[in-house]
Structures are given as structure tokens and as C-alpha cells.
């Protein structure tokens, strides 16, 4: 018993020493016991045409406000914010300091941008959530990526939108875009009042999409999971859906429709906007 306890103490000592070495002069923060820290950075919005954010294991929260500058603030235990400006690009890098991330308290990077900002925004998070509260923002190119965390964007306009989630939910609400590429490897996706040319690819997880307007084509490719679509009554669409293993059902009032167990073709209005749905394993419901 004494030998076991001794070995455990030795291992603990080694880990603590490693944690101190990892943090250099910052001292002991192996278990997140250092003082609460927060850092801020300001940039003049008129000098910036792209905001590039890289966060390792920290939640990123983007907020649009009536302001002239861009303000980034990071808070939490054992966190660090690096920033630079070059060629019109503001780069923000947020990461946790310490040895094992599962000992850290919740950390967050809040970036406040002017409501009149109209350029590019790119966010990449390793294992944190990404939240974009657009507040009516009208941006050019928006790219959101999360490895292990949820992605949420609302009240946003973007000419080009890219959303990539590896493990976690994806949720878009009140988003207008010319073209959007939405991909999820493992997790559920929910769209509500999203317009534009949409391409949705999902490996594993359920998709639920509710549209009040369809003004361009919609492509859905899903490997494993169920799909549920709610379409507007006045849609001008032609729809084709097929499932290799699963059922396809509908309660939508198509003008023309042919529905079998695993296929569905339907037309509403002049069939202007095309909807293609391809499911390998899962059910499809259209209402």
C-alpha cells in the first residue's frame, strides 16, 4: 500500500513540475489555480477588411454593436490572447495555458464588432463553441468551423457562408446568403429561415430545416440520419428525394407529386427552384 501511495506521489510531482515548466515564469497553473485573467485588444474597424479568429479550446462569441472599433476580450483561467494586424487582416489567437485542458474553467473570447462592418469574418475553434449574433450584420465572406463544439449564427447576411462542424450541433436562424456550404460530420443540424443557394452535407446526425422562403436551389446529401423539411405554402419548387434505406413521406401540398416508399418527386408552382435530397440511411419527412 505504501509503495502504491509513494508511486502516486512521484507521478503527481512529475506532472506538477511539468505543468510549471510548461507555463514558464507564470508559475503554477497546472490545475487552474492562478488568478482570474482577462486581456483586451482594440482595432480601428476602418483599417480592417478581414477578422481571422483561431481558438483552441475556448468559446468564441461574436457580437454586433453600434460602435466604431473592434474590441476583443478574453476571460477565464489560464487563457491568453495574441493579436496582430497585417495587410488589413486582424488576427486573434486565443488559447488556454496549462497542462491538461479538462481542469480549466469555462473560458470565452468575446469579439464586439461594429454593426456597419461589411467585410470578411473567419472563426476556427478546436473544442469550443462558436456563437455569432449578427444583429443585422451584412458581411462578405463568413467561415465558421468547430472541431468539437456547437456552431450557432443568427440574424446575419453574408454573400458567401461556409459552416463546418465535426462533432457538435449546427444551428442557423434568420440567415440570408447568396450561397452557403453547410457540413457536419457528427451532430444535428437545424436551419430556420435561411435563404440562398444552399448545399448541405451531413455524415451522421439529423437535419431539421424550416423555410419561410425558398429563393434558390437546395441540395441535401446525408449518409446516416433523418431529414425533416418544412416548406412555405407559396414555394416555387421542383423536388426530388431518394433514400437507399429508409422511408420518404410528405404532407406538403404539391401541385404535382409522385411518392413511393423510397422516392419522391414533386412540383409546386412553376418549379423554379430545385431541391435535391439524397439519403443513404434514414427517413425523410416533408411538410
Pin down the residues of each PLM region:
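Positively charged n-region of N-terminal signal peptides that target proteins for export
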Residues: 1-7
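Right-handed parallel beta-helix
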Residues: 33-50, 59-63, 67, 78-164, ...
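Hydrophobic membrane-insertion alpha-helices, especially the h-region
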Residues: 7-23
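Short aromatic-acidic-glycine turn motif
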Residues: 73, 79-82, 246-251
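A short, Trp-centered hydrophobic/proline-enriched beta-strand micro-motif
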Residues: 52-54
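Sec-dependent signal peptide cleavage junction
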Residues: 20-38
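Flexible, acidic/glycine-enriched loop-and-adjacent beta/alpha segments
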Residues: 70
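Short, surface-exposed interaction patches in beta-rich subdomains
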Residues: 154-155, 161, 170-287
Amino acid at each position: 500500500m505504501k509503495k502504491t501511495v509513494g508511486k502516486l506521489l512521484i507521478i503527481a510531482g512529475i506532472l506538477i513540475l511539468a505543468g510549471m515548466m510548461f507555463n514558464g515564469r507564470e508559475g503554477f497553473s497546472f490545475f487552474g489555480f492562478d488568478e482570474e485573467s482577462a486581456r483586451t485588444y482594440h482595432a480601428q474597424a476602418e483599417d480592417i477588411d478581414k477578422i481571422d479568429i483561431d481558438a483552441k479550446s475556448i468559446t468564441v462569441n461574436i457580437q454586433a454593436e453600434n460602435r466604431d472599433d473592434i474590441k476583443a476580450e478574453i476571460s477565464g483561467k489560464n487563457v491568453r490572447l495574441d493579436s496582430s494586424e497585417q495587410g488589413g487582416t486582424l488576427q486573434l489567437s486565443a488559447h488556454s495555458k496549462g497542462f491538461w485542458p479538462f481542469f480549466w474553467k469555462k473560458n470565452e473570447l468575446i469579439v464586439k464588432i461594429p454593426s456597419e462592418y461589411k467585410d470578411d469574418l473567419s472563426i476556427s475553434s478546436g473544442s469550443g463553441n462558436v456563437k455569432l449574433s449578427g444583429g443585422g450584420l451584412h458581411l462578405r465572406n463568413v467561415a465558421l468551423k468547430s472541431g468539437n463544439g456547437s456552431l450557432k449564427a443568427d440574424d446575419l447576411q453574408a454573400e458567401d457562408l461556409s459552416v463546418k462542424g465535426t462533432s457538435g450541433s449546427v444551428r442557423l436562424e434568420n440567415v440570408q446568403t447568396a450561397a452557403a456550404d453547410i457540413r457536419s460530420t457528427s451532430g444535428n443540424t437545424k436551419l430556420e429561415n435561411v435563404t440562398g443557394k444552399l448545399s448541405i452535407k451531413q455524415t451522421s446526425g439529423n437535419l431539421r430545416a424550416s423555410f419561410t422562403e425558398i429563393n434558390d436551389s437546395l441540395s441535401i446529401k446525408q449518409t446516416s440520419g433523418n431529414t425533416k423539411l418544412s416548406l412555405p405554402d407559396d414555394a416555387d419548387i421542383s423536388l426530388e428525394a431518394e433514400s437507399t434505406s429508409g422511408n420518404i413521406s410528405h404532407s406538403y401540398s404539391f401541385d404535382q407529386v409522385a411518392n413511393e416508399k423510397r422516392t419522391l418527386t414533386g412540383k409546386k408552382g412553376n418549379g423554379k427552384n430545385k431541391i435535391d435530397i439524397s439519403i443513404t440511411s434514414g427517413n425523410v419527412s416533408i411538410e
